[in-house]
């Protein structure tokens, strides 16, 4: 599972509880996009979460 290259956000594990309170392991996955960005004047493909994209932490290459 990819992680965000900016903030390091990745998937987390937890339990899903049924009505009878039985639990099974489930995963929460971040909204990660592959983005072409400009890093040190070169075009690089990064895995970036949607929160970092909205915050403007990545300068996208057009």
Swiss-Prot record:
GO terms for cellular component: ribonucleoprotein complex; ribosome. Keywords: Ribonucleoprotein, Ribosomal protein. GO terms for molecular function: structural constituent of ribosome. InterPro entries: Bacterial_rp_bL28, Ribosomal_bL28, Ribosomal_bL28/bL31-like_sf, Ribosomal_bL28_bact-type, Ribosomal_bL28_sf. Pfam families: Ribosomal_L28. Disulfide bonds: none annotated. It comes from the Bacteria. The keyword Nucleotide-binding does not apply. The keyword Ribosomal protein applies. HAMAP family: Ribosomal_bL28. Belongs to the bacterial ribosomal protein bL28 family. This is Large ribosomal subunit protein bL28.
């Amino acid at each position: 599972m990819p992680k965000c290259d900016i903030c390091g956000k990745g998937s987390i594990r937890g339990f899903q509880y049924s009505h009878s309170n039985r639990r099974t392991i489930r995963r929460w996955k971040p909204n990660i996009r592959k983005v072409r960005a400009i890093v040190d004047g070169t075009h690089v493909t990064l895995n970036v979460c949607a929160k970092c994209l909205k915050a403007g932490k990545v300068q996208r290459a057009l």
